[in-house]
Each structure stands twice: as C-alpha cells, then as structure tokens.
Amino acid sequence: MIYENLVSEAGLTQKHLIHGDKELFQHELKTIFARNWLFLTHDSLIPSPGDYVTAKMGVDEVIVSRQNDGSVRAFLNVCRHRGKTLVHAEAGNAKGFVCSYHGWGFGSNGELQSVPFEKELYGDTIKKKCLGLKEVPRIESFHGFIYGCFDAEAPTLVDYLGDAAWYLEPIFKHSGGLELVGPPGKVVIKANWKAPAENFVGDAYHVGWTHASSLRSGQSIFTPLAGNAMLPPEGAGLQMTSKYGSGMGVLWDGYSGVHSADLVPEMMAFGGAKQEKLAKEIGDVRARIYRSHLNCTVFPNNSILTCSGVFKVWNPIDENTTEVWTYAIVEKDMPEDLKRRLADAVQRTFGPAGFWESDDNDNMETESQNAKKYQSSNSDLIANLGFGKDVYGDECYPGVVAKSAIGETSYRGFYRAYQAHISSSNWAEFENTSRNWHTELTKTTDR
C-alpha cells in the first residue's frame, strides 16, 4: 500500500479508507503507536509503592507499577518464558508478578527473580538479568498524568504536547491538580480508533444536531444549541492545533460542561471562585481557559472534555474495532460530594451506556464500516470548514488558531501530523516533513 497521499496538503481531505484498511492499521501500529506518547495512568491511581494498573499501548498491554523509590515503570504484560499474559487483574498492589503457566516470578521492577526448580532443570544456564520483562523505555508525567513511549528519538512529553500544553495547564496544574477516578468504564465499539479521536479533537459542529435529544433532556448550559436551533455566538470559542497533532476546541465559560441542571449551580460557583483567584496568579486569559470547556485530543488516542470531567482512551483492536476506556477527572480540592456526583454524571453521559456516548457511537461505527466498502473507501472525507481563517503567532493564543467555536482547524492539524507519521520511517523524517507545519496549515489559497 502507498501511504504518501492518504491525507491532502494541510489536512483538508482524507481518503475514507483510512478508517477501515487492514494493512494501514498494521502500519499505524509501527508508525503511530510505537512512536508517539501514549497515556498510561495517573498518579492518583497508583499512589503507593507496589500499586499497579494494566494499560494499553496500541494493541500491546503493559503493567504500570509504582516503584519503592516513588518512580513509575512500565513493562509488557508478557512472561519472558513462553509469552503468556502475566497479570490478569486491572489493578492491585503486589511486590511481584508470578506467571500462572510455569511459575516464573518477576519483581515489580521487572526483574526475573525466581524460576521453579532452577538448579535441577537449568543448572547455571539461566541469566536472570537478561530475562526481565520488556520495559517501556520512556515514562514521563504531565502534572500527574503518566504517558509512555517506546521510541527513544521522540521529543520530551512537554515538547510533544507543544502549544496544547499552554491551554491544558490552567486546569491540569494551576487549578491545584486533578484526580482520575477509576477503574475506567470499558466498552468495545465497531469503529476505527481515529473516528472518535478526530471527533473529540475539536468538533463542535455536530453537537447541536447529533446530541439534540441529549441536550434537551439534560438541560445543560449547551441546551440552546439543541436541534441546531442556533450557532454559538461570535466570539464564543476558538480552535487550535499543534505541530504534533494534539488540538482542541474551546467554548468560553462552559465550566459545567454537558452536565444537567442539578450540577450547574454548584459547579459554576466552584469554578467562578477559583477563576477569580487564578486571574491574580496566571492572568485573566488563562484563568478564563480554566473555567472554559475544552474538547481535546492528545495525539493519537487520548481525549479529554475538561469541564465535563470526561477522560477517554481509544484503544485500537483492529482496523474496525476499538475498546473505549472512560474515566472521570475531578479537581483535587472539590468537595467530596461534588467529586462523586461529577464522576457519576460522567458515566451517565459518556460512559459505556451514556446517552451522549450512544449518540456518538452510531456516527463513529457507520463512518468506519463504510470505509471498508469499495466505492466509499476511495472517496474523500472533507475537513475544510474555516480554512483560510487560521493564524499562527497570535499575540495571545499559541498554536495555529481560529477564533471561532465551530470549524475544523484541529481536524486538519490532527491529520497533517498523522500523514507525516505514516509516510515517515522515523522521528527525523517526521521533523523534516513538519518543518513548515504552521505555514502549511495557514495558507489561504483556494484548494
């Protein structure tokens, strides 16, 4: 398969087949998931030595373990002897892990510690130091959110987040920090992983129509959009994208998010009081970002609705199947009752049986299923909404930015980075291809 022209210049169109091609999916495992930073867990889920969770990195499962010195390490969840899955629990606390096949035992640091009948059967031929679990070589944290990367040449996590970090820090850092409420709700959908990732990267266009019934029944601050009764007013938000594909849409002052009327007064009061405090520390603009609704995707497959408290990982299974993990995010200093109610509301709206989630899944699944059909697969998907209005170097807002609540700026940035990865054999080639990334995205010539 030829991978060079699946996305047009500036990400304006994508071949529909990218959502359903088996060969391309295998190529993505090598060029996307083995190369980029992938979300693993949060400090709040593994606070003590010996705490561990299992997570996915592409189709591979890893054990993420808090070490005795407080550091975090991650290892493939595969016994080095005969390749059996080592840990079947989603989370726990353990000094080590013993394989249920032949009983080989590994420490929480990944080292091979015990082999049954080692002397009798192997003599002195077992070199334990060479037979530890395969380790994820790079682990870094963004204000408690832990990511892993298999590629030694990748930029640091902060550099990888790029301009998106500026928008995320008001709530991830300056708010006083976040907690992740787990274990995640899990569900398998018959959709390519990119379908939900692109939707969450900044698609406000679909909200009024796709979610019309959910908006009406929930009576959230976004209910006036139901049924496309209106557009967000001018100046209601912005979109942004970055060099490495992470991007978002911002809806100003949307702190209570998609949640229903019973949560709105308490959330708006809590967020309003903190916004006033933050304005003195980080300025009015970033304090307003804290209290605004960000729908964001950290490239490639981690999505966040900040004020709605939704945190997603789109774990690929194959070219047409994705396992969706849904956590709730809450602010550390929220009252415990508000934390609980917000976490419950996340599962009601965007959990496995959530009504907003159900609205979206039909779109994702049919988009992906049609990608496997002959005529459909060869057609172009369009992402040109707002093209020509994007700017780079705005005096206030970093990244490539469009000052509109609705558009496809972040779609284009996501797929520009995607194309650069799948047509590059390593990070050096990606960087060379991306040296003029913002110029490409902000051209104003007709396409």
Curated annotation (Swiss-Prot):
This is Naphthalene 1,2-dioxygenase system, large oxygenase component. GO terms for molecular function: 2 iron, 2 sulfur cluster binding; iron ion binding; naphthalene 1,2-dioxygenase activity. Its EC number is 1.14.12.12. Its cofactor is [2Fe-2S] cluster; Fe(2+). Pathway: Aromatic compound metabolism; naphthalene degradation. The gene is nagAc. [2Fe-2S] cluster binds at residues 79, 81, 99, 102. Binds 1 [2Fe-2S] cluster per subunit. The lineage of its organism: Bacteria, Pseudomonadati, Pseudomonadota, Betaproteobacteria, Burkholderiales. One of its GO terms (biological process) is naphthalene catabolic process.
